[in-house]
Amino acid sequence: MDISRRQTLQAAVVAAVGGALGACGTQDGGRPAPRGERAVPTGAGPAGGWRLPDEAHPHESTYMAWPTRTIWGPDVSGVRDDIARIAQAVAEFEPVRLLANEREAPAARRACGSGVEVVPVPVDDLWMRDSGPVFVLGPDGIAGVDLHFNGWGGKQAHGRDSRVARAVLDDERITRTAAPITAEGGAVEGDGHGTLMVAESSLVNDNRNPGKSRDDIERALKDLFGATTVIWVEGVKGKDITDYHIDALARFSEPGVVVLSTPAPHAPRNDFTGAYEQARTVLEHAVDARGKRLDVVELFEPADIGRRGKDFLACYANYYVANGAVVMPRFGDRKADGDAAATLRDLYPGRTVVSLPVDHLGEGGGGIHCSTQQLPKAR
């Protein structure tokens, strides 16, 4: 079975890294104690007043993480260039806090410049969307959901990354909510008004949630994120390390409007083409939490990706919405790049669309959205 994004590490390496981290315990390096922890009572749902805000909600900051040689090997230099480029672009619009292992923090500061705050926190990898907390807003301000990151079902070393959510919440002094399921932030997309989109392949999966049914997981999602409607697409198991995250397929630009990553005309068929077709059918017939049908906007993938590898993520839908900006990938297909930028300008009026070359991330099977996690303003 081919696993993209990063090839699974050898078991010996995983064991060695995990063992070393286990000896470290949960020391917080002197960070202040968090405000506390919030339980998620069964059936609490939106009645408790907590909700997942949409990504366009104003941000306090963006969190990112610095890639490590342990995971990326000889490719780490190019990947770090991409991360620095994204961090600098986002920092033009809002504060960026980039987590880095202490010994690598000076190099991260040099690469990113003074406009990016580098925070020494142990990390394994760069995918902050998945390892970081997912923030929710409610009557008591803000809380962070810890989804118990487990390396996408144990596919990669994650001893440090499994503690990243707690470390961020401790540092921000934000209440932690321990989820009753295992998932990643990239597996959940919300419109900010009670509707979620998820892929079944990455959630109803024994490598994250053994013994839990789709109904069990849906109840947990509704309780955690204040949702009343969950739209499920099938996705694809075992074809990429995430088991197919929704944020590489479909995004809400606003309530009732879904941006759908669409294969280029005449693109060869594969497992992901079938997943797209199934998702499109679901979305065209779905209704949101308001009981309204969705408007599906196609965001065509590039037709020409040159000599890039088979696992390359050529997906414009993996963009990031910052304060006053949309940060999107650029792939070198001038027509597709231009069309995608124009579509996003129409969908996000008043925001600057910034397009960046991030081919090293793409070769790893991820993108800009995968590498970022927003901290929303509590208002």
Language-model regions, residue ranges each:
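Short, conserved catalytic or interaction motifs in soluble domains
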Residues: 26
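The feature marks the mature, well-folded catalytic cores of soluble enzymes
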Residues: 33-379
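N-terminal secretory signal peptides and thylakoid transit peptides that target proteins
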Residues: 1-16
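C-terminal motif of bacterial Sec signal peptides marking the signal peptidase cleavage site
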Residues: 22-23
